[in-house]
Each structure stands twice: as structure tokens, then as C-alpha cells.
Amino acid sequence: MACVAALFASSALLPFPSTASSVASASSCGCRVRSTVVARAPRHQRAHRGLRRLDEVEGVSKKRRGIGGGGGSGGSQASSSRRDRGLAVDFKEPQVADFDDLEEDKFLNAVVKVYCTHIAPDYGLPWQKQRQHSSSGSAFMIGDGKLLTNAHCVEHDTQVKVKRRGDDKKYIAKVLARGTECDLALLSVENEEFWKGSEPLQFGRLPCLQDSVTVVGYPLGGDTISVTKGVVSRIEVTPYAHGTSDLLGIQIDAAINPGNSGGPAFNEQGECIGVAFQVYRSDEAENIGYVIPTTVVSHFLNDYKKNGKYTGFPCLGVLLQKLENPALRESLKVPSSEGVLVRRVEPTAPASTVLRKGDVIVSFDGISVGCEATVPFRSTERIAFRYLTSQKYAGDIAQLGIIRDGNSMKVQTVLQPRKHLVPFHVEGGQPSYLIVAGLVFTPLTEPFIEEECEDTLGLKLLAKARYSLATFEGEQIVIVSQVLAHEVNIGYEHMGNQQVMKLNGTAIKNIHHLAHLVDTCKDKFLTFEFEDDFLVVLDREEANAASSDILKEHAIPSVRSSGLSEPYVDPAEEIQKTSEDFGESPVTNFEMGIDCLLWA
């Protein structure tokens, strides 16, 4: 069935972009969805307007949040012993000598089709989930009984099935790890019959510019395997639309369409050089697709092998300014045209103990950092400084060469993944909530913002979501999303999307802390102080008595999410406050809107 949809046309990168929506009839880009949906791209993805996950290229998403996928299936004729290869990326001999006769090469049979059933959380009604829907995507065999695909292909999965090329039987698959930042997911299939005669793919090295590349998958337009060819156009640190992170990416001009997401990209030797995952769409550009390179794939697989789970890509947690201006360098006593200026350090980052505002970072693990925040890459290229931190693992130590007040020195810091005050993905899949006398409290998250639409939140809350930093471990912005009308909350029933600041004079740290304060309160009244000095006072005993009626009226199973029943542990003995509320959020570099400022 043909897919007719309006494309997001603008390519501008805006900090507060305008909204857009479209309707598609049969397929999404990257996953093939089985129902008609109204789409609205997530706010953090609309910030770099043209960049889309494959499932969002034609505007189809799962009601409020995109779902992923590409196409693929596989059936193979090679030795089953190949299944037991390790997960490590192998850069040795090519799997085939000639790539010209692609249809005859057995490695095509390592590409499988993924069928996923999704049930996404309902962030507006956090005690329930959205309607179930299905999509299809791609994956491929990498050895040791494992499959690799995109994380957005299996987001919010309840059931995952895979089918090999030339076979009509589907097998149940299990999601072992899901890397939201790098948009990768690891699957396993326990049924030995699925692996009979399987031939896993071999990974190749990072390609060079103008190298030929072939993308394999099952895009819309047919049911059999599809092959498209092109060349490598660019290799650089790229914004990942699903993960909202900046990692190494390969730009190609081969057609990547709905159905290719999660499928492999091959070089001329038949080695897999990456995973297709997103495209760039605008009125002024065409044939711009992106592939996750094997360096990122290797990091993801090694992370899982080392820790038994995905722990993420670490960073320094600093806001850097380029030092191109000679007068600026002279004022900082930087003798050469190198180094980047530290303008801000995240309070929760380990680097906050060794770096401070005004330091100039001139080297990272002995590698010189240029004044444009770039470092040497391969023989004659340069790449963004962020590339060096992304090669590390959580808990690794980095040695920094810095200039402080004109003096050169060496410092060491531990690298950890960034923790957003307003997270882009909800861990565990289900949002937390607390209901007090009909007031529904929940942490502010990007999925909630997408679902509610920016217009209903107010500029102040949106500014906090985008520009505020967490000042201590575990901090959240807690809001009242709505009020379930009852006589106990008369006068407050029209509240919605307002941040709660204090309860009975105590500053609220997170949703769990709020639940703890409510549970331990002995006062006659519950006094909530909201932003803009709005006050809500409830009789504590009346509020408790009204709970059962409110739950029954709205068919809600509990006054709180399951995690809030656990004993509360204070996230920090001492809360380090910052004097600046805005302008220091760990948003992506493209969202900063200022070319000379970037996070690393």
C-alpha cells in the first residue's frame, strides 16, 4: 500500500521550534505501522528540525511518541557453528571477496525481520498505558545467538518476534539491552531452530569518504529484501534523534526509507560497517541518510559484555566555549591557538570537583584540543572534542591538561553518563505519580511535554525543562498535571502543569520525597506552595478520606505508583544550590543555538 504523508520540511534548528503534524496512511519511516496515526515529532527532536528517526520521516508516530523499525528477514544456508562467535567487533578478514553479485552472498540471509508489539505509557494518565499497536523493523545476526537492531524498533515492547529470510515462521525474541543514546538494541532468540544454518555478519572498519556503501533492508514498497547503494558522504559527530546525544555517525547518499531502520550497511567487501537508523529531511536537501558506525556498535556491545547491561556513553559535563578570538586567548593567558574555555560545570558531574569556570582545557588523555573544540581524527581529519569522551566507558578516568590563571596543570576526573534534570526517556517505562486529594503529581519529563503539547505548559516551565541543571543527585521537577474534581479540592480543580515547590515549608526534591513528606505529615493541613506563589491548602484527614472515592470514580488502581511505596532515601545530605536557574541545561549542542558554545 502506498504511503502518503506530509514531510516535515523545515531544516532550521530552533531552541523553541514551532509545532508540526502530519497524517500517514500505511507505513512509518523506519517501521511499518498498522494503523493511521496523527504525528507530532518530539520536542527534543524538533529542535534539530530536519533530523528524523526513520520511523518519523513521514510523520507517523505512535500517537504521542515515535516507534521504530526497518524491515528485514533472514534465512541462511551456512554452518550453524558460526552462531557461537563472540559479540566483539571483528575487523579481520572480509566475509566475502566480491560484493558485485549481492543476491548470491550468504550474508544477506543474516538480515531478519522484526515484528514488535508496543504499549507506550500514558504520561497524562500515568496509572495506565496507551492502546497497543504493532510495527515491523530490521535486525541482523552478530553471533553468539544475538541480533542487533535499533532501540526505537523495540521501544515500549511487549512482544518481539523475528522471521528469517525465505521463512514464514516467526520466533519469539527477547530484548537483552536497549541503548537509548546510541539507538541500538540487543536481541536474543532461544529457539535453536531459528539459528539452524545461520551465518552471522562480520563487522568492518570505519570507512573513508567516497567509499561505496550498500544498505539492506525491507523498506515500504514491497515485501522482499531491498538493496540500495551509495557512497560515504561525511563522517562526523552527529546528533542522534532518538537518544538526543551527539555520537560519531556516517552520512551516506544511499536511499534509506521506511523499513531500513535497524538493517546493516555493507562495504564492498561484504563487511557490515554500520546500522541504518535515521535520515535528514528538508526542502533544501535530499538523499541524506545516517548509519551508526561500528565504533559506536562496538562500544554498545562491549558495555553490555562488561556490565551485563547498557550503562551509557560518558561525558565531562562541562559547557565549553571556543577560543578562536586572539584577544580572548590573550586575556586567559593561553599562549597558542589551542584549548577550549570552561563556562560551566554540571553540579552533579564528577568533573565539578576538579574543574571550574574559567579553566581552559588544552588536552584530553594527552591529545591536543584545538581552539574550535576539535581534535585530530585519523591522518588528516579533525573531529569534535565530544568524540574523545564518547570512546570512554562509564567510570573511566580521563586526564585533562588545563590552564588555570595562566598556570598549566594536569587533573584527573571520572567520566559518567549525563543525567538530565528533565529526562528524555523514562527508565522502567512507566512514569511515577502520586495522587493527593485529587491532585495528580508527576515528575516533568520530555515524553510528558510531548504528550501535553508545549502550549499548555507555559514558558517558565518550558524554560526550566530546557535550561535548568540538576543541582544534586536525584533532583526532579515535580508538577501537578491535573486535578481530579472532588469536593475536597474545590477551588483548585482548574490547576494543571504547575510546579510544586514546597510542602509545609519543606522544599521538594523529587516525587519520592513528596510522597515521603505526605506520609509523615502530622499537621492538620497539607500546604502546597506552587511556582508563582500559588497556594493550595488541604485538610489532611479529609484528603485521606477522599482518596477511596476519587480512585473509584476514575477507576485508578492506587494513589501512587509502585516505586513510591519503597522507603525513601535522601538523594543528598547537602543540597548544593546554584544561583543561576537558566542557560546551563545539558541540551544537545545543536539545541544551544550558539555555535561557539557546546557541551562535552
Describe the function of each predicted region.
Residues D98-E104, V114, P219-D223, C272-S336, ...:
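C-terminal cap/linker of serine protease catalytic domains
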Residues V114, L125-Q128, E190-P200, S226-E286, ...:
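Active-site region of chymotrypsin-like
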